[in-house]
């Protein structure tokens, strides 16, 4: 059981300014090490993106090994589920390992650790068409081949037709899917 949860905000200063978007992402993640002062070496640390929500109801399945949360992956809202690949998101490990190996090691290797099945939710590209379009133009994959078709008009079509921004078809979320706890700020994303 988690006795105490500690949240700290870390500001990434002196961001890389080059053309490589991955260097910025990795730098920001590395800055998490600056927020560990006073955290015991045996504390559990979660390495996650902001749109990944671990299911704390499955925390009892943790052991003393680094563990990844396999997650339901929703696209645009809870209406659509992405099934193109399994999503292995949040990684949980001990603070000492986190400090020794660094956050990018765990994020880059999250598919290699033991995992808890369906232990959370990845809320990918939630928001209106303008917000999603802005994300697609600025995130680390923005310069990948084939991304030039991601105009605002196409993003609007992707959302209305249930098409992943890379072109694959999304499925309607099955009714039996376990959903995250309902928060009033998320009401517009429930169908």
Regions flagged by a language model, labelled:
Residues 115-191:
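C-terminal accessory extensions appended to soluble enzyme cores
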Residues 9-13:
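Structured recognition/catalytic domains enriched at protein termini
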Residues 21, 25-37:
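Short, conserved alpha-helix that lines the donor NDP-sugar binding/gating region
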Residues 1-6:
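Short, small-residue-biased leader/transition segments that mark boundaries at the very start
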Residues 39-53, 59:
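Short beta-strand-to-loop acidic/aromatic patch adjacent to the donor-nucleotide binding site
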Residues 21-25, 52-150:
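Conserved catalytic core of nucleotide-sugar-dependent glycosyltransferases
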Residues 16-26, 44-47:
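Surface-exposed cleft-lining segments at the edges of enzyme active sites
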